[in-house]
Amino acid sequence: YFVPCRNGWADDYSTHTRGSFSFADAEEGGIINNTYPNTRTDFSQAIASCPVPIISHETGQFQIYPDYAQIDKYTGVLAPWNLEEFRRRLREAGMESQAEDFARASGEWAVRLYRADIEMDLRTRGFGGFQLLDLQDYPGQGSAYVGILDAFMDSKGLITPERWREFCSQTVPLFICDRVCWIADNNIYGDIRIANYSPLDLAGRKVAWRLSRQDKGRTIATGTITIEPQPKKQG
């Protein structure tokens, strides 16, 4: 297998095998940051020329503003001087009272971005998989606060394990469409797919779906589909 963040070089995103980069490494930070939001884009073009499975390297890396309450957890030989310095600068700027808001807002945004990036992997047929930079924060080497968990493997309260597994699990239902925002008179068109990395054959199984309003919980439409057998790869 091959573990890159891109398979070769190009002037566009056609060789990318993850959805985001630094602005120094890709035009405007990559697919997620610089293309119209949708759930159809995948990495099929990037993996087409590779004869072995591709595993996306360090998917994510979405920065989350740190929660300074974790400073008290450092009771061993590692001192959180970086966190203390960040808090000092925020205090000098007169914004220390907003620290929790910054942590919560950036964390909620990071969860959405992780979902977008991971689902891009899952809807790429024939993809070998992905690896995150880390599920937890890494406070060394320049402070990589990119984790859904803090450096002590404790939850930041951003998402429950159950919600995380809705898009990061061995079997994930996916809705494929060209946009993620609609107005009242738009028709919604899309495809339903199942990303299945489990050992189970799901062909013939029934999948129930429901479209509802999140604010009122009112059901708009329901239905069922039958999972079709996947065509076998030739050659």
Annotated model-derived regions:
Residues 1-150:
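Substrate-binding/catalytic cleft of secreted carbohydrate-active enzymes
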Residues 57, 133-136, 167, 195, ...:
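Generic beta-strand/beta-sheet core signal
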Residues 106, 178-180, 197:
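Outer-membrane beta-barrel proteins
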Residues 114, 123, 157, 185, ...:
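Active-site-proximal structural scaffolding
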Residues 153, 158-173:
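Proline/serine/threonine-rich low-complexity linkers at boundaries of modular beta-sandwich domains
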Residues 180-186:
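Short, solvent-exposed loop/linker segments at the N-terminal edge
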Residues 186-228:
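Beta-strand-rich binding/interaction modules
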Residues 232-235:
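Aromatic sugar-binding surface patches on proteins
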